[in-house]
């Protein structure tokens, strides 16, 4: 095991986190004021930057023969994620989303519990799980009986950070790091194998770094298109459109509202999100090839065909079950499409109370939850 290479991986990852932390810090200055920005993001940036610089200081540059090997790649990926989650938890904790060291008259046990909650929220974000502990009983920003929407009561800059963690986690923090590491030392493919799931890693470009840039470019483009669609077609506020675009493309499901997409009560918003949830469930390599005109790749791709089949079958069966209990056909199709894609891609948005749907519909959704995972 070459620990200097591990220090390089971890060090550059910690330094790379300064970019999203700094970005959200600046947005917090604009939307919530200097005091909160300094309180929430400055400590996280100092910790991340200090640790990153210290680890890079321990790195001894290797020659071309000392490329990144599978052993260092797998260990590095295993260490990057918890370290990233730890740094990602600090803005919630220091910023008062959960009880932290800057909350007045807080007990030590509550501060420790607040750190655990912050860790949970960060882990859920970076892994795109979408579960949340933001509630009236957990957040000091939510007053029971007074605050109607607990999530929306949080500072804007910290909600943006929450959504951005899902966006970064969706393509993979390590995938982003490959853009840097594959240039500094060799062996980027080893890091990719350690990070990415699936039977193979297709190269869209001659070099792995170019492939990573191509995929991130596609990811960014789709995110921007969804932002614009939600804002100018769906009628969302700019802030909500940005946040929901950040959490749709990674199939994350964080929302700025307790009621999720149901809050907007808009068929237009639901249709836009349906389109992008479907795209988020498609292999990005395949989307790139289709964008280049290679539609035969989609026809031949077994994964894509299976995706279409199980989504289509689920939509037909659940729609029939809803129509049989008196739901109008158009509404049944819309609700079914939304929740089949939301659950089938593990996004987790909700636009209706599907717990009240017929038993057969709930069973199908449960099976989709397993398949989508």
Can you describe what each PLM-predicted range is?
Residues 1-373:
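Membrane-proximal intracellular helices of multi-pass ion channels
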């Amino acid at each position: 095991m070459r620990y200097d290479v591990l220090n390089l991986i971890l060090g550059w990852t910690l330094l790379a986190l300064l970019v999203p932390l700094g970005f959200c810090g600046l947005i917090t200055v604009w939307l919530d004021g200097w005091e909160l920005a300094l309180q929430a993001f400055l400590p996280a940036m100092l910790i991340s930057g200090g640790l990153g610089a210290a680890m890079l200081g321990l790195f001894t540059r290797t020659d071309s023969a000392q490329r990144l090997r599978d052993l260092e790649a797998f260990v590095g990926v295993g260490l990057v994620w918890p370290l990233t989650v730890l740094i990602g938890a600090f803005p919630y904790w220091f910023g008062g989303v959960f009880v932290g060291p800057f909350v007045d008259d807080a007990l030590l046990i509550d501060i420790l519990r607040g750190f655990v909650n912050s860790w949970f929220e960060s882990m859920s974000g970076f892994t795109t799980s979408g579960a949340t502990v933001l509630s009236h009983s957990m957040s000091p920003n939510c007053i029971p009986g007074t605050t109607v929407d607990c999530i929306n009561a949080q500072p804007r800059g910290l909600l943006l950070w929450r959504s951005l963690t899902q966006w970064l986690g969706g393509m993979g923090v390590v995938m982003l790091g490959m853009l840097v590491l594959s240039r500094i030392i060799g062996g980027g493919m080893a890091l990719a194998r350690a990070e990415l799931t699936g039977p193979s890693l297709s190269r869209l470009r001659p070099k792995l770094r170019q492939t990573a840039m191509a995929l991130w470019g596609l990811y960014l483009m789709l995110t921007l298109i969804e932002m614009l669609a939600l804002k100018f077609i769906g009628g969302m506020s700019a802030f909500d459109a940005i946040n929901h675009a950040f959490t749709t493309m990674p199939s994350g499901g964080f929302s700025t509202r307790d009621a999720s997409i149901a809050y907007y009560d808009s068929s237009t918003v639901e249709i836009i999100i349906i389109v992008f949830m479907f795209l988020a469930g498609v292999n990005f390599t395949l989307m790139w090839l289709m964008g280049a005109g290679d539609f035969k790749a989609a026809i031949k791709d077994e994964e894509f065909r299976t995706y279409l089949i199980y989504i289509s079958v689920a939509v037909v069966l659940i729609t029939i079950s809803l129509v049989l209990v008196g739901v109008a056909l158009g509404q049944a199709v819309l609700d079914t499409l939304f929740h089949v894609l939301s659950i089938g891609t593990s996004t987790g948005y909700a636009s209706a109370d599907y717990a009240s749907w017929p038993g057969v519909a709930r069973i199908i959704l449960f099976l989709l939850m397993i398949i989508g995972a």
